[in-house]
């Protein structure tokens, strides 16, 4: 099972309540828009990390603006170990694809890019922390290289970006 499928299942009840509240058509529209925006910003960030000079070529202005807001955070990344790496944990029987394993402010971290239409608080990011904990654990399991930290870099529409930092051990237990 993928980490994404597992976490989706855990949050299914909340998503169902939200869909009932806003209606199926509106929920589908919002979901498509969020997914598309997230993919565009994620792709730019990946190209930027890989030092591809044309990382903004042909990209819509809203995605460029959101990406540019997170550049100061991305520039704190160094010593990249893995970009878009497929990972599997024999222990947890889970698989997934990490955005990035690299040093953030000098600490080897599982780094994930997120986008949001509005500012999120720490309490609304638990699934992100569990996802990051899985990536850190699976990377260590596969390579023998310890990854203790989780970093979530979140571009927020028309707002300053958010940075969440957690430790793997705190979020591995729920998995």
List each language-model region with its residue ranges.
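Metal-dependent nuclease catalytic cores that hydrolyze phosphodiester bonds in DNA/RNA
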Residues: 1-95
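Mg2+/Mn2+-dependent nuclease catalytic core
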Residues: 82-175
